[in-house]
Amino acid sequence: MKKLLYLFLFISFFGYSQTPITAANFLTAINICLSTNPVDGLCSDSEYGVMKDWDVSNVTNMFRAFEQRSEFNGDINSWDVSSVTNMVGMFQEAPMFNQDISNWDVSSVTNMSYMFSGAGAFNRDISSWDVSSVTDMSDMFYSAQAFNGDISAWDVSNVYSMDQMFYGALSFNQDIGDWDISRVSFMFMIFQYTGISVSNFDFTIIGWYNNATTIPTNIRFTGNVGFCQSGDLLYDLINKFGWEIPISGSSYSLQSFYPDCSTTGVDDQNQLDISIYPNPTNDKLFIQGLSDATKVSIYNVLGK
């Protein structure tokens, strides 16, 4: 009986001999693990074990955890990050990282500034993240050149800073008009040097204008992108809400295609081989004469 007990104790000790990950040793564990396995973190000989299997549930701060890890691209999707509040610069300048982290529970995170800044390869689906606690998203995707994820459903209603959020995100081209920007105070250069199209920028501005619980005032808003259908609303933001929006004339200015937009109204049907009826309408609108399958978007005079 004693031999069996000793054997059980030995097996128990051997099975749990790895050093637990704590808030105090988290960064040390990363440094030790990646010193031997810088690409995948499969440091089985480390006192902390293989990185993907770490229990990080007690870690609250992941500030710059993988900053400037030029080779790292390890699988950490199974991490329990539900206690983390700070992810500032977590993958900043980690140019190779492009792993699935869609399973992460980020509902406690309040700061994601610089999180993927300079993470040039990252382009994973993070659309399901609960970011409702986040207040700072400034520079979040700064120079994240590959990122073009659909994050249109994010709840950003508590965010106050989006300064340079997509600056240099050359591939980013999404309509994020469903965002409630009511609490935002900073948007300087949010779309500077992005890939956002005229139509997606228009949809974004139109959506923000119509969806905000309260339209924020005195926003400094710049970005060298083009606009068309959102022209009236942009001028409203300038004249009624005090937004500082330079239009044409510098590398930080919006480029106006307004009012010469490639949008067809009911008055154009005589120039085109189509019929649009009835006008006005309260319910249904018919467009007759389109020979090919065509995507049609319909707006009222406010862009809704």
At which residue positions do the language-model features occur?
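C-terminal outer-membrane/trafficking sorting elements
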Residues: D268-K304
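Sec-dependent N-terminal signal peptides
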Residues: L4-F13
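Bacterial Sec-dependent N-terminal signal peptides
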Residues: Y16-T19, D268
